[in-house]
Amino acid sequence: GEMCDALKDFPEAIDNTLRIAEMCNLELDFSKRYAPVYKVPGEKIEKDCTFPSAPKPVEEMKDDERYLRQLCEHGLEWRYGTRDVSPEIRARLEKELAVIISKQFCSYFLIVWDFCNYARANGIPVGARGSGVGTMVGYLLGLCNVDPLRYGLLFERFMDPNRSEMPDIDIDICQDGRQKVIDYVRQKYGHVAQIITFGTL
């Protein structure tokens, strides 16, 4: 073929390419999702942090679920001045966490929280927009500054328990610091892809 003609003086290059190709084997299982994992540093888990409305004991929680709950408890104190919040706030938080946990999305929230924290610590303005603003968990993590209960925002617009699609949290990052945040995510989490959406008329 064309490559053989182009590399006729280097037949071993063609042979080696074929040999490498024959050794490659990739099987992708599209029946399940592959979500990123947030590795919770052991020292970050507070042994004495309690979760008054959690449906199961702490010992049965995965690390990412426990850490997300812990951050939400601190978020209640930050946003409302106390963890002893109204039943309405507590019910909304538990409803959201139940869906997030059942869809194995705790790590995703933690990763977004992590790079937003990094951005703020480096003076880079950052914040959520779109349906992700309608989450109590996002509000408690500081991803956005809109109380979804106060403004009647629906969690289901972001993450419907009856639908299988994976949601995403749209985060706006200041242009001046965006590359620094991307570099941080790439350095910390490894496999990072930049996605673009093209609209057509």
Kindly give the residue locations of the regions a language model identified:
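A structural-propensity feature for long, helix-poor, extended segments
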Residues: 3, 7, 155-189, 194
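Conserved phosphate/anionic-ligand binding catalytic regions in large, soluble enzymes, centered on
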Residues: 119, 123-145, 192-201
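Generic structural marker for isolated residues within well-ordered, non-membrane alpha-helices
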Residues: 73, 134, 182
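Short, well-ordered alpha-helical packing segments
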Residues: 18, 113-116, 138, 156, ...
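Non-catalytic structural connector segments
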Residues: 5-125, 131
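Class I SAM-dependent methyltransferase SAM-binding "motif I" and its flanking Rossmann-like core
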Residues: 138-165
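Beta-strand segments within the central parallel beta-sheet cores of soluble alpha/beta enzyme folds
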Residues: 32, 150-156, 195-197
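Short, well-ordered loop/turn and helix-capping segments at boundaries between secondary-structure elements
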Residues: 19, 23-26, 142-146, 160, ...
